[in-house]
């Protein structure tokens, strides 16, 4: 069984037992969180597609950890002007483990 849910402006395809990195959520490590913005739920033979959300669809997950992603380097450069600017950014994330999916 798998589901597609929305969190942090992004859509994630998950199955029970998978670990997913989401945009940072203000939830303590070890707590359980429920996602109710489920767009699709499918088991072996049936597929429930929401319009836009699946009625009664829910994805339950446990927060594993919080952290920061690898650094992304941004370089701005102006040709022939001896000007360049180098910046970096590390995005915060929350890692969750999917425990249950229901339609």
UniProtKB/Swiss-Prot annotation:
Pfam families: Ribosomal_L21p. The keyword NADP does not apply. GO terms for biological process: translation. GO terms for molecular function: rRNA binding; structural constituent of ribosome. Keywords: Ribonucleoprotein, Ribosomal protein, RNA-binding, rRNA-binding. One of its GO terms (cellular component) is ribosome. Part of the 50S ribosomal subunit. Contacts protein L20. PANTHER family: 50S RIBOSOMAL PROTEIN L21 (PTHR21349), LARGE RIBOSOMAL SUBUNIT PROTEIN BL21M (PTHR21349:SF0). This protein binds to 23S rRNA in the presence of protein L20. Belongs to the bacterial ribosomal protein bL21 family. HAMAP family: Ribosomal_bL21. This is Large ribosomal subunit protein bL21. It comes from Shewanella piezotolerans (strain WP3 / JCM 13877). The gene is rplU.
């Amino acid at each position: 069984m798998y589901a597609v849910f929305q969190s942090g402006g992004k859509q994630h395809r998950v199955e029970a037992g998978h670990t997913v990195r989401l945009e940072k959520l203000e939830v303590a490590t070890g707590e359980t969180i429920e996602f109710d913005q489920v767009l699709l739920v499918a088991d072996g033979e049936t597929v429930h597609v929401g319009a836009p959300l699946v009625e009664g669809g829910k994805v339950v997950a446990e927060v594993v950890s919080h952290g920061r992603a690898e650094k992304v380097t941004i370089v701005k450069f102006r040709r022939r002007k001896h000007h360049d600017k180098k910046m970096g950014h590390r995005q915060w994330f929350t890692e969750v483990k999917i425990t249950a999916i229901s339609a």
